[in-house]
Amino acid sequence: MTIFFSVEILVLGIAEFAAIAMDAAQQGDTTTILMLPWLGYGHLSAFLELAKSLSRRNFHIYFCSTSVNLDAIKPKLPSSFSDSIQFVELHLPSSPEFPPHLHTTNGLPPTLMPALHQAFSMAAQHFESILQTLAPHLLIYDSLQPWAPRVASSLKIPAINFNTTGVFVISQGLHPIHYPHSKFPFSEFVLHNHWKAMYSTADGASTERTRKRGEAFLYCLHASCSVILINSFRELEGKYMDYLSVLLNKKVVPVGPLVYEPNQDGEDEGYSSIKNWLDKKEPSSTVFVSFGSEYFPSKEEMEEIAHGLEASEVNFIWVVRFPQGDNTSGIEDALPKGFLERAGERGMVVKGWAPQAKILKHWSTGGFVSHCGWNSVMESMMFGVPIIGVPMHVDQPFNAGLVEEAGVGVEAKRDPDGKIQRDEVAKLIKEVVVEKTREDVRKKAREMSEILRSKGEEKFDEMVAEISLLLKI
């Protein structure tokens, strides 16, 4: 699909510029940081948690994203941050086929993802105007916008890359670029055969898109000022952090896990009914099922997962999502006939959205059937919930392997054709949530949670020291 954008929308209004400029002038001697995440929810969430931590250290934060994304994350920002974190709207070019409410990956139909990347890159001119107006002391940017550090460099503004993915997948991807004739030094990690085949047989168009995004990702890493921030922690990826530091000749500073800490009694749309249902279950007896905001399982995948849940005989909450604009799909049509009736009180199916962190933190949740998106992996580890990994694409197979290596979860193996197997899903759910065979996984997940919760705000000390050194403050 080809979408034509008008560049006129990139022009920032005089009134808006004046308001931002006045705010910048009022900051005086305060060190200001502009943060620019990619448009995916996992990226936004991690950046927002980092913004909170920086503001607690007396930095003033400008948080820049599209209006639809800013509206989505504002409820997660307590009023105590209203003076230290300011939202700044980034205008993407739009068109009748690509209006502003689609300027996010959340629920975006996969066919429109290339258009979103194109529109984001075309926002560079507007972003330059924002940088010129605010004149922040530092830019912290994500990994899919090489134009951001270029613009910052032209304005003599130092920039640091904050990577919201895991370190293993980055170091594994960079290794053949630096050492094309040698094996990755950590040979104990092996992808399942299905994923090896999938990554080696991508079609030409996918390969070209992947190549371009890989180049952008690589540029963002190398453009960072002597330091790379990573949403991870040494207990999980220490050896990969050390190796990435060697590959990039930059200091890799962990700041993770960056996880939204929910208040179980807080107001979230639809949570009261979920909480009431969870409260009736036994401790650690329920499995939470979700595949993130950007992947929509096929009907065949939905059926295999449903049959697996049914055969496991374990309580479950399953979040089912459909792309924006899909008004033809209903839960009943997507699931096997009679599934909801047979599940009865043992299962709850939620359409669209559910407060994942609150569900994972609830005492009756004992397992997480997850696509292994990095944000979900971090949340699961923070709350001590073991993972049953059902990765779908991009970095998720690598994350699932890392989860297995850490001992806090297991990956569901696919059949020789790469399809999800209902029997495998059922078996792993029972083992992880109920049976003694995976008690070691449950124990390791609890231990990991205790380690992470003991860190507190001290995990940001190294980051603050590096920023202070860079800015000479």
UniProtKB/Swiss-Prot annotation:
PANTHER family in UniProt: GLYCOSYLTRANSFERASE
Extra facts: Mogrosides, the major active constituents of S.grosvenorii fruits, are a mixture of cucurbitane-type triterpenoid glycosides that have been proven to be powerful and zero-caloric sweeteners and can hence be used as a sucrose substitute for diabetic and obese patients.
SUPFAM superfamilies found in the cross-reference section: UDP-Glycosyltransferase/glycogen phosphorylase
Tissue distribution of the protein: Highly expressed in mature fruits.
Highest taxon, organism lineage: Eukaryota
Enzyme type, top EC level: transferase
Any one biological process term the GO annotation gives: carbohydrate derivative biosynthetic process
Entries under InterPro entries matching the protein: UDP_glucos_trans, UDP_glycos_trans_CS
Binding site for UDP-alpha-D-glucose: 293, 356, 374-376, 379, 395-396
Catalysed reactions, semicolon-separated: mogroside IIE + UDP-alpha-D-glucose = mogroside IIIX + UDP + H(+); mogroside III + UDP-alpha-D-glucose = mogroside IV + UDP + H(+); mogroside III + UDP-alpha-D-glucose = siamenoside I + UDP + H(+); mogroside IIIX + UDP-alpha-D-glucose = mogroside IVA + UDP + H(+)
Documented EC number(s): 2.4.1.-
Source organism (scientific name): Siraitia grosvenorii (Monk's fruit)
Active site per database record: 43, 142
A Pfam family: UDPGT
Family: Belongs to the UDP-glycosyltransferase family.
Protein name as annotated: Mogroside IIIx synthase
Known pathway: Secondary metabolite biosynthesis; terpenoid biosynthesis
Gene3D superfamilies registered for this protein in UniProt: Glycogen Phosphorylase B
Phylogenetic classification of the source organism: Eukaryota, Viridiplantae, Streptophyta, Embryophyta, Tracheophyta
Gene for this chain: UGT94-289-3
